[in-house]
Amino acid sequence: MRVRKLSDCYKNLSNKNYPIFLLGDAKDILKNIEDNSVDFIITSPPYDNLRDYKGFCFNFEEIAIEIFRILKNGGVMVWIVGDSVINGSESLSSFKQAIYFKEIGFKIHDTMIYQKNNFSNPSKTRYHQIFEYMFVISKGNPKTFNPLIDRKNIYAGYTSLGENTTRKRDGSFTKQKKRVIKEFGMRYNIWKGNTSGQENMCKSIKHPATFPLWLAKDHIKSWSNEGDIVLDPFMGSGTTAVACKELNRKFIGCDIEASYLEFAKERIK
């Protein structure tokens, strides 16, 4: 498996051999991908000054426009991002990016939270920061949603309490039958779990900011189907690639740092 260079042309993605690893700047690489060709995007971009990316920075607005162009109608992107504290104030870069996505035509389908089980860089003047935003952004209405039914109901086995009603268009109500509460319900939009640092306590993931495999897999399962094309424009150490291999998705990833791509290739062997 080779790391392919920007000079390669990526048209007609349905006929390619996957996974595809692309070396170069995301804004340049995405311009070589055809319109309306990607089913799902998940990524955690370098934000503010929190990540050492070998001195590189990225042009958010150009990349956002290219993402809108290449994502299929009904496609979804999960944009995992946080904010740094600059001169005593949070940057709010995450919200500025979400607003820009909406301005160029996306829908902000959901604002989810990734709550970590641990924290780093504790502050003496504010509570420990243990979450990142996960903006679920769609091009039109999402065409795919496979909800994860793994939240344990504390009232499982009981008959639903009270009398449920459905309001009709004319304002009247229709009574609904009582039901037995199932053991598991749909997950909430705050996802709590181990960070990749905890997952890989005894491993060496050669990247400054990986997100955990379970997080990538759960989003891929939720917003795409087997055989779909999944893109990570800031793939880093290749966690999304590993998830796609395990879940039978067609992966495309790019990164500006060659060492990250080489390490990602090793992870999926």
Feature-to-residue mapping (PLM):
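PRPP-dependent phosphoribosyltransferase catalytic core
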Residues: E266-K269
